[in-house]
Amino acid sequence: WSVLTETSLYNSMSTWGDNYLVANVWYTSHLWTHWRYTQDKEFLAKAFPVMWDCAQFWFHRLIEDRGFDSTKDEQERVRNYTPAYKFDPDGTFVAPNEFSAEQHDNQTEDGTAHAQQMIYYLFQNLSDAIGILGVENTGLTTEDVAKLNLYLEKTDKGLHTETYTGSWGATYNGVKTGEKLLREWKYSPFDISND
């Protein structure tokens, strides 16, 4: 369920972002989009097992949020010019060690916005598909549905905000001190990256 996602027209590949494990969710999202466009229940019934297999991968891969403390290794923090920040665990499920598709100079982190939003979208689509097809037509047990509902309830949705502190200047990339930002990272602040 993980692939190299940087494939060119000439069939060559790149290992940039080679830990892009959420690619499977990206691919299965197109199955749901096809259903939404066509309303073809026969297609949805064929697509459902693929979407469910993808969800099972994430049931095993997601971890309970472990929080983050940039001050644990003070020498490393200073060497990388990382600001001091700390987040306590919040009890949600997060995708471990993912990268943000829009940022290239920050390390991977648990619970990036892109990964979390895609995974939550998959779980929501499956819940909707069960409602459309009827649980009896999906091959799922009541335990399977309960597990999906648990993950749907406890998975971090990938929507976090912060207030820009002005640490890179009063205005940085058009953002003014005190303005609210939508985060790409669950923990790392806006000013962590030069991208």
Where are these regions (language model features)?
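Catalytic cores of extracellular degradative/oxidative enzymes
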Residues: W1-V22, W32-T33, T38, E42, ...
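Structural recognition of the beta-strand scaffold that forms the well-ordered cores
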Residues: W1-V3, W26, F93-N97
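Active-site core of glycosidic bond-cleaving carbohydrate-active enzymes
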Residues: T7-W16, Y20-Y37, K41, A45, ...
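Long, well-ordered core segments of solenoidal/helical folds
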Residues: V50-R66, L152-T163
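Acidic/histidine-rich catalytic neighborhood
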Residues: D53, F57-I132
